[in-house]
């Protein structure tokens, strides 16, 4: 069977690399983390965590929905990354992205077969299943074409604006917002977080 371990960070919504490393061991097969916490706005150190996990032979899966489209999200040391389009990518619901490291694709067996992900000349029945050699192997049937069109338009907009420009603008707004909230007596979650871990999400009361 599979044993699931839940990471309980010392501070809510703030996961430090050392806490991840302390939880995994020689039996750990995969670690799954969000690139940014949806309440605290804390961005994890993806490269630091991913590099160490890889050195230990542990797969790294990232939920990137809170950073893709808002901040650069490195995947050099990530095996899988998924993100829906409807948040920071500004795209429609039911559209999204899935990144699978090239070296991992041969290890993953598609669970659904269809006319898109199989090599099947002339649609003649075959004795064996021969999957497409690239990411098409995971796209079995007709795609969400309208969603893809909308998603493509949103990506064109983001590329035109520039991801670094978007990230810089979000952090500039945060630098103005957080002191203003503190001055009014608000309690701001992780107000003192380094900008390398900050995002466009600010929670306060």
List the model feature ranges, each with a label:
Residues 1-205:
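Pyridoxal 5′-phosphate
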């Amino acid at each position: 069977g599979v044993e699931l371990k839940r990471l309980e960070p010392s501070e809510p919504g703030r996961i430090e690399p050392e806490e991840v490393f302390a939880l995994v061991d020689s039996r750990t097969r995969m670690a799954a983390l969000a690139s940014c916490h949806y309440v605290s706005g804390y961005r994890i150190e993806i490269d630091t965590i991913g590099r160490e996990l890889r050195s230990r032979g542990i797969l790294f899966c990232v939920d990137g929905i809170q950073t893709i489209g808002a901040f650069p999200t490195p995947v050099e040391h990530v095996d899988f990354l998924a993100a829906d389009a409807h948040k920071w990518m500004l795209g429609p619901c039911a559209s999204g992205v899935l990144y699978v490291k090239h070296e991992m694709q041969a290890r993953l067996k598609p669970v659904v077969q269809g006319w898109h992900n199989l090599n099947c000349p002339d649609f003649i029945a075959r004795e064996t299943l021969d999957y497409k050699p690239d990411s098409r192997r995971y796209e079995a049937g007709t795609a969400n074409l309208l969603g893809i069109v909308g998603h493509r338009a949103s990506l064109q907009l983001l590329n035109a604006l520039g991801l670094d420009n978007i990230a810089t603008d979000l952090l500039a707004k945060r630098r103005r917002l957080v002191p203003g909230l503190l001055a009014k007596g608000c309690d701001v979650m992780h107000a003192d977080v380094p900008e390398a871990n900050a995002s466009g999400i600010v929670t306060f009361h």
